[in-house]
Amino acid sequence: MEKNLPDIFFFPNCVNVFSYKYSQDEFSNMSNMERDSFSLAVFPVIKHRWHNAHVVKHKGIYKVSTEAHGKKVSPPSLGKPSHINLTAKQYIYSEHTISFECYSFLKCITNAEINSFDEYILRGLLEAGNSLQIFSNSVGKRTDTIGVLGNKYPFSKIPLASLTPKAQREIFSAWISHRPVVLTGGTGVGKTSQVPKLLLWFNYLFGGFSTLDKITDFHERPVILSLPRIALVRLHSNTILKSLGFKVLDGSPISLRYGSIPEELINKQPKKYGIVFSTHKLSLTKLFSYGTLIIDEVHEHDQIGDIIIAVARKHHTKIDSMFLMTATLEDDRERLKVFLPNPAFIHIPGDTLFKISEVFIHNKINPSSRMAYIEEEKRNLVTAIQMYTPPDGSSGIVFVASVAQCHEYKSYLEKRLPYDMYIIHGKVLEIDKILEKVYSSPNVSIIISAPYLESSVTIHNVTHIYDMGRVFVPAPFGGSQQFISKSMRDQRKGRVGRVNPGTYVYFYDLSYMKSIQRINSEFLHNYILYANKFNLTLPEDLFIIPTNLDILWRTKEYIDSFDISTETWNKLLSNYYMKMIEYAKLYVLSPILAEELDNFERTGELTSIVQEAILSLNLRIKILNFKHKDNDTYIHFCKILFGVYNGTNATIYYHRPLTGYMNMISDTIFVPVDNN
């Protein structure tokens, strides 16, 4: 199979690659190797121009129905032409005349090997390819890209490293090899914003064919970019939509998939070769309907993302190509080498467009003295913002560990600094309106954020990062703050240096950084359920294997005790969030209850019917003792009395002191048990 991407098929980055139409005179002056490059045009031409086409006779000349209107006729017999008319682009025989393209149309039959194509066929493929606008050259202008993919506006000018000819060749060779690909690159080289667009281009040209050595039938499937959060789906799809010269989704090659998607974000005329931006959960529901699978933010180890990797690896023959993208492989390289079958590793060298300066602010308190450490950290933060201040009209991002700390640090900073203060995290509504204020303000803006801003939203005027170096890692019925990993540091640092030079101020000792094994602090039921659905062998088929396998097996026993069939579980997985696995017992009771419970999981609207149903599950928690936290909050120290984690201690906040027991409705809603 052809492994190298000829120059004429580069994606137009509008910097040193442009859309281009080649003339027959240019073809005549090419070397044999250059001419042979046009043989690969047969694949996109068959898919997008000759599919369902036929021969017509137009003004006495045989042509393809895509060239001219006319009555369908039987094709003429073809030998070697007696004359070539380069100006009219026609082959002339004693009895008839045929267009270059029609000649190629008749010669390019199933099982024809492309290395057998002669000059006569190649000239016709050149004409057909010109009509499709699939060729490129190092000369041209942006406006030449209008119409390449049906776009009304030109492609964006992209100087990033991932769209250089060298990177395009390397990525194409990996894509066409059908090996799993692990792609890394510094923040700012265009991994997420450009590589999916490049794979869309390759899929448009060559996707669906089992080989590029000869003509075969094709089975066209879209590309999917699977992402951990809805915010990322919306952000990256919009970026690529605009960069491909579209202003609306309908009729474009871009589609979105996530739960409760609004009508206006549904592409009602999607392209078979297009790219779907999807949340991980919805990616899993139709995983094998896609030809190329791209999984982004691999370093985050989102639970469903890791499951997709495991499923794709187990069933790799059902997917043409898999790309795993991450900023760094610091934590996962060795595991990926062992886990994936013959993986290809690609690194796109490069850095952010602008220089990033680093500043270390030492905290003299040991982190083991948690409260004292945080108080010193807050004092250091005020000093750092005073010393390293964003310019007027710009912003800085303060990374803290949790949503609660966002409010704590904002309150602290507001009392000591004269700048505009904002909070952005995953639970904040109308983030766009907050950003409008940030962008329109002539003042300095300071944005306090949980790790959400590592990747979910790009702040265009940010010049400074103030990184506390911690993250809250949830665990069943609790969680803990931990210092970040190297990959998380790279993500946070990379928020600056994209538009202007930036400054990264960090408040933690680098020796504190460590890899975070999220699977060791997660509910494991999804691993069990998806393993059943996709015939995974546990634990060896998991990308990341839990340290404590006892919990995995206890989870399996707990799920088996529900007495729900695998078929029903699969339907539940496809249709509902099931943030608590116990909800499955209710989803199977009645369609009406299932609809109300689903609405509760999506919107938080708790009806009396749903509350009573959940209370019937008896998800009981024993209150051991409590203490007063502030005016309207009491901390309750409790013990879980149900499920896999029966006996686990938990800390629950409530607006008044409680004794005895409470029932769990969700991870944030608890109902005291009446002691009477």
Curated annotation (Swiss-Prot):
Q: Which residues form the Helicase ATP-binding domain?
A: 172-347
How this chain assembles, per its entry, is:
Monomer.
Domain Helicase C-terminal as annotated: residue spans: 366-542
Q: Which GO terms describe its cellular component?
A: virion component
PANTHER family tied to this protein = ATP-DEPENDENT RNA HELICASE (PTHR18934), ATP-DEPENDENT RNA HELICASE DHX37-RELATED (PTHR18934:SF99)
Which PROSITE patterns does this entry report, sorted A to Z?
Answer: DEAH_ATP_HELICASE (PS00690), HELICASE_ATP_BIND_1 (PS51192), HELICASE_CTER (PS51194)
Q: What subcellular locations does the record give?
A: Virion
Q: Annotated motif DEXH box: location in the chain? A: 296-299
State where it is primarily located. virion
The family annotation for this protein states: Belongs to the DEAD box helicase family. DEAH subfamily.
Q: Which InterPro entries match?
A: DEAD/DEAH_box_helicase_dom (IPR011545), DNA/RNA_helicase_DEAH_CS (IPR002464), Helicase_ATP-bd (IPR014001), Helicase_C-like (IPR001650), NPH-II (IPR021892), P-loop_NTPase (IPR027417)
- What name is this protein filed under? RNA helicase NPH-II
Extract the GO molecular function terms from the UniProt entry. ATP binding; ATP hydrolysis activity; RNA binding; RNA helicase activity
What is this protein's function per UniProt? NTP-dependent helicase that catalyzes unidirectional unwinding of 3'tailed duplex RNAs and plays an important role during transcription of early mRNAs, presumably by preventing R-loop formation behind the elongating RNA polymerase. Might also play a role in the export of newly synthesized mRNA chains out of the core into the cytoplasm. Required for replication and propagation of viral particles.
Give the E.C. number(s): 3.6.4.13
Q: Which organism is it from?
A: Variola virus (isolate Human/India/Ind3/1967)
**Which positions in this protein are listed as binding ATP?**
G185, G186, T187, G188, V189, G190, K191, T192
Q: Which UniProt keywords apply?
A: ATP-binding, Early protein, Helicase, Hydrolase, Late protein, Nucleotide-binding, Transcription, Virion
Per its record, what triggers expression of this gene product?
Expressed both early and late in the viral replicative cycle.
Q: Which reaction does it catalyse?
A: ATP + H2O = ADP + phosphate + H(+)
Top-level EC class, please? hydrolase
